[in-house]
A protein has these predicted regions:
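Membrane-proximal basic amphipathic "stem/tether" segments
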Residues: 243-244, 249-289
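A short, amphipathic alpha-helical segment
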Residues: 21, 88, 235, 239, ...
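Short amphipathic alpha-helical patches
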Residues: 110, 200-204, 222-223, 238-241, ...
Length: 289
């Protein structure tokens, strides 16, 4: 099975160098690496060409450790425009997005994930739609946090109301882009959320979690402005995708569900349950009087 790893880059030469090296180190041979550069003015293009020259390949395509790498460098209209270019160039059955600065955590991780994929698909009539693992996040203060995302729980509307599946450790069937369309280029930050919502929640496509640490994701570029824009776009998309009758009920029930999760996280649910039972008995006693 061919996995297409798509890397988006713009003026991040050092990050690109590290990303290329992490992909080149993979022991799994059947990797197609598509690099979409947005017309960088730093050393990015020269770094790609160095790899090409080192492997005796012509510009635009190179072979590294049995991996096919195809690339282009031209201006784009934003990250989702660039990602869609990468999807159009892809020929693998599954796509993984690993942007410049992001790393695969060890040389065997792709092999591990493909083995899990083969085991899952061997038990199914149709190939899995999305398979995802864990990622580690490098925070702006240098701390590294472990993120299992949904951690194997059901992928539901409620989950997408408060978050999204992580992108870099996900293997997405290329057939889903053919079925649901590619990323919405009118959005600046939330198009992957929209695609997941349409395919996994509304389209009920299959999804599987594998407890493997797959990628190291650089969070240093995530600003408060980006977070605010994400919330704005997400709310707009909820209005666009979810019928109003369902959405109104969901808004009404989301707050108590969120509070319930917080209480469980801090091990206070037992106390709340005790108080609830006391109030129930008092209410029952009052009715019987």
């Amino acid at each position: 099975m061919t996995l297409t790893i798509i890397t988006i880059n713009y003026n991040n030469a050092e990050g690109l160098r590290k990303t290329l090296a992490s992909v080149a180190s993979q022991t799994y041979a059947d990797i197609e690496h598509v690099i979409v550069d947005g017309g960088s003015t730093d050393e990015s293009v020269e770094i790609i060409r160095e790899y090409a020259r080192a492997n005796g390949a012509h510009a635009g395509s190179l072979t590294n450790n049995c991996h096919q790498i195809h690339w282009l460098s031209e201006p784009d209209n934003g990250i989702y425009h660039a990602m869609n270019k990468g999807i159009r160039m892809a020929t693998g059955e599954y796509c993984q997005f690993l942007n410049s600065g992001d790393l695969l955590l060890n040389p065997n991780v792709t092999q591990q994930m493909i083995e899990h994929m083969d085991q899952i698909n061997a038990q199914r009539e149709e190939p899995i739609g999305v398979m995802y693992g864990n990622m580690k996040k490098v925070m702006p203060d240098g701390k590294i946090l472990h993120d299992a995302c949904n951690g194997g729980h059901d992928v539901t509307l409620e989950m997408f109301y408060r978050g999204c599946l992580n992108h870099s450790p996900a293997y997405i069937a290329r057939a889903l882009f053919q079925k649901y369309g590619m990323y919405d280029e009118s959005l600046r930050i939330c198009s992957d959320w929209k695609f997941y919502m349409q395919s996994l929640v509304l389209g009920d496509e299959s999804v599987e979690y594998v407890n493997v640490d797959v990628t190291l994701f650089d969070m240093t570029g995530i600003s408060e402005t980006n977070k605010n824009l994400l919330n704005k776009e997400r709310n707009q998309l909820l209005e666009e995708l979810i019928p109003q009758g369902i959405l109104k009920d969901y808004h009404a029930y989301h707050f108590p569900m969120d509070q319930y999760r917080r209480l469980k996280r801090f091990h206070l649910w037992g106390l709340v349950h005790f108080i609830e039972r006391v109030l129930f008995k008092l209410e029952k006693w009052h009715i019987l009087r």
